[in-house]
Amino acid sequence: EVIETPSLMFYGGRGPQSEGWEFWNFKNLTSKEFKKNKKISSIVSKLGKNNHGYPNECLYIDRYNLIYRLSENCNFIDFFGWEGDKPNLKGFINEKKEGIVDYKFSICIENSNEKNYISEKFYDCILTDTIPIYFGCKNIKEIWSYNGYILLDSITDYQKIEDILNYIHTNCDYLYDVMLPELKKIKEEYFNKNNLLKKINDIAGNI
């Protein structure tokens, strides 16, 4: 049962600015309001140029290649983890939430493409009312059927992804307003049913 349970963790960052984001305190985020004044972000380390010896399901190389391409062609996206002389290359940040809290959309690509593997990359966005532009978990639609995220079917079809991102950029406010209620359904269900603390409690109660 544990193995077949989707990964349901999140990560808000560490350090003095992370107060209130601790895992045991995360339910307070349900009532927090997030004012969004920016469009699209990406948080990906520039160091991930290889798969570090992991199997083919790992996405380090494909993710790096995609973000490199987008950083060259999509100047309307703010890229965190990448440095350069362009104003949208934001470099290193101390707290992950700096790269998602103010944004309506954020690109989220997992470390691997596997069943049930949904990491903090997805849930950090959900918890901050940021629409994930997502690729990773093979069966995410079985886990979350709501239309609160944009699912990419590939991260190697660069032109298709750029077309999607340009459409989001052009129609950002409209898309966000339409999709936010669906995102909040995921958020509510996550808090009340599908999170790690709830799962542990349910398992412990059956022992």
Predicted regions and their residues:
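Pol beta-like nucleotidyltransferase catalytic core
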Residues: E1-I207
